[in-house]
């Protein structure tokens, strides 16, 4: 009879766990990673909308450069992440959810601002204000110039996009940054966009997660919000 009682207790515990799993799944906390660009101009709005709909769900956010976020996904520290730039790690599943455009910007009085077209060679002849090595933005810019056979040596390297914007506004060189981050400065006239060929700096934005990561229903819903977001 003792073994029978133990068996019944185990069955009861498993049944209780099965009943609780849906409630846990629906209210599971979210651990979301983001690149610096998307953590600056996109993720805050997404989190605000999601938390207005689901105030009971706790959200923990990590914002670092794409390389660091990619490693955090591999190490299973995050449920998923939003990044720009291609991720090739075999343990990561990536999905394009949107796209954005990088802009080459400078102060209105910059010598290239009056040109009808600007070549990569023109840009490389000026001081370049770029993101730090390891960031997706830096990798894209380096690949772009290398495709034209041009090696670059940035005058400024910074993890802070605001520092690069301020440097460009003060006439210290050319910055190459996401349009989302420089939109206000362009509207105010503090910066001007240099006329590169159309679509030369268009890039994809990705949702990434570990291939073995189970996504709760709350995580799935947040990802759906990302897919539907217009910006």
Give the positions of each predicted feature.
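Short, small-residue-biased leader/transition segments that mark boundaries at the very start
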Residues: 2-7
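Alpha-helical linker/hinge and terminal dimerization helices associated
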Residues: 8-24
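Central regulatory/effector-binding core of bacterial HTH transcription factors
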Residues: 27-90, 158
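A late-sequence structural motif
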Residues: 42, 192-231
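Hydrophobic hinge/microswitch elements
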Residues: 65-70, 74-78, 83-84, 139-193
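Flexible hinge/capping segments at coil-to-helix
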Residues: 89-102, 106-128, 133, 217
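Beta-alpha-beta core module
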Residues: 89-96, 100, 115, 162-211
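Secondary-structure junction motif
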Residues: 112, 127-148, 215-219, 223
